[in-house]
Amino acid sequence: MVLLKEPVQPLPRSSLLYNNASNSSSRIKETRKVKLLYNPLTKRQILNNFEILATLGNGQYGKVKLARDLGTGALVAIKILNRFEKRSGYSLQLKVENPRVNQEIEVMKRCHHENVVELYEILNDPESTKVYLVLEYCSRGPVKWCPENKMEIKAVGPSILTFQQSRKVVLDVVSGLEYLHSQGITHRDIKPSNLLISSNGTVKISDFGVAMSTATGSTNIQSSHEQLLKSRALGTPAFFAPELCSTEKEYSCSSAIDIWSLGVTIYCLLFGKLPFNANSGLELFDSIINKPLEFPSYEEMLNGATSGITMEEYTDAKDLLKKLLQKDPDKRIKLADIKVHPFMCHYGKSDAASVSTNLETFHELKVSPPSSCKRVELVSLPVNSSFASLDSVYMENFDHNNLRTGADRNSTYSPSIYDANTLSPSAYHNIGSRESSYSSFSSFTSSTAFASQISIQDAPAIGDQQCLIGESGSSLRVNSCEFPQYTTMSPVGEYPFESTEASLSSTLTPVGNVPQRIKAHLVEGKSNSKDDLRIEADASLVFEASDAQRTRRRMSLYKL
């Protein structure tokens, strides 16, 4: 059982959090250089000092990844934002800055409150098409109010939460909203999925992708005509306030729209369904503007998680919702009045600290501990590689006209080494490379350009022993180091060489101005007192590796 802790009491306006909000940004680290690495052993990507572990969510305004700080071991959430807007009809070379990215960053830099998700670091590399926000990780995920097997838009009730559990959620959200509004921030997208629960049970407001703010701290934000059009197109329609759905009156984006969406959220938590629903957007907007608010009967409420409520509690809940879902924004209840409403303060006060939730309701994602590997060799990736697949690499927005020839490429390549026990770095040699478009049978599906690099990677040398490279004609000869093993490793698997020939033809498939298949294999033979290892690729790229000491080596295929 997970205890939901007591909600945080709002700070007085004399607090430093109110008067010195600008100081919050000084706690946030801003990094202007992004380095992307790939771990071929764990098949995970590493963004600067953060190992990407899993996907937490894919929203309209960005993806969110679970990551581990390699320095501290702490878990964080990384939100990935597109720096440029995607506009149909425009050339790929015409890049339009996404104004919501800077807006979200500026809003979050001003926030520092226990009921608001914390921003730790901003990774903003001008060379990258992405902007990364390193955020506080709330391990119990978003607030759930309907069964997992039900779509929220089709939920018909009852709720899986009790009235007491819902009250605890609402009190934390009200505390967070009070802080935001005091800073002149209107969230504009309050809903259960944007309310995250930390490991200690605190509810935190997240996702400021459509939030609006003013530098003066005013809670009434007048929008320009362009902002008006955008604000009506962004957010979650089922949680829109009536003033967002209507085009008849002059629109002002005020904190009252957060009060409305809070009312819709509370309705979902208490009754397990949306207060206004329809089959189309126009019907939904008409329902929000004109349809009177309706409630399930008290008899219906006696089923499920709400079976223990009294008629008085049910009546007070309806009264609060009527004041929250008031169609006239000027008549809507204020946050301060919500906290003292009978529904919020007359029930369950004596045992508030004992309120708990089932693990099935607020489950915690289990994360495996860091890898125990003592030595991991990391491959540097292009800064604009994608996190779309954690076991593949592909480049976005790559201009085919900018492809370089082999002569233009830098012949030296040194992957980064992450060594937990300060072992000697491995010897790495770039045997050869070619640039074209590649696609893997398993996960490479992008039609943009790739660089394929075939490399021989030797095990660590002992003492001062070095690996020597010799060149003969069109072939490269490598003298091996220590540690006997025949293994080929790539992002798509490992291939041990037990026999005299092992086919690698399934590793890469070319797309573009190259032969339609790559045929690569290893041939083992004997010449005098040494073993010759021969690696072939599509009959035109031949590498010979000589092993004079009859030791073994591993070969890696990396797709960059």
UniProtKB/Swiss-Prot annotation:
Record-annotated active site: D189 (proton acceptor)
Keywords on record: ATP-binding, Kinase, Nucleotide-binding, Phosphoprotein, Serine/threonine-protein kinase, Stress response, Transferase
UniProt-listed SMART domains: S_TKc
Domain of life where this protein originates: Eukaryota
Sample GO molecular function, one term: protein serine/threonine kinase activity
Entry PTM: Autophosphorylated.
Catalytic reaction list: L-seryl-[protein] + ATP = O-phospho-L-seryl-[protein] + ADP + H(+); L-threonyl-[protein] + ATP = O-phospho-L-threonyl-[protein] + ADP + H(+)
EC assignment: 2.7.11.1
Positions contributing to ATP binding: L56, G57, N58, G59, Q60, Y61, G62, K63, V64, K79
Annotated Protein kinase domain residues: 50-344
Family according to the record: Belongs to the protein kinase superfamily. Ser/Thr protein kinase family.
The record's note on its domains: The C-terminus (residues 351 to 560) is required for efficient SNF1 pathway signaling.
Function: One of the three SNF1 protein kinases (with SAK1 and ELM1) which are required for growth on nonfermentable carbon sources and nonpreferred sugars and for response to environmental stress. Activates SNF1 by phosphorylation of its activation-loop 'Thr-210'. Required for the regulation by SNF1 of the transcription of a large set of genes, the modification the activity of metabolic enzymes, and the control of various nutrient-responsive cellular developmental processes. Also phosphorylates GAL83, MIG1 and SIP2.
Protein name: Serine/threonine-protein kinase TOS3
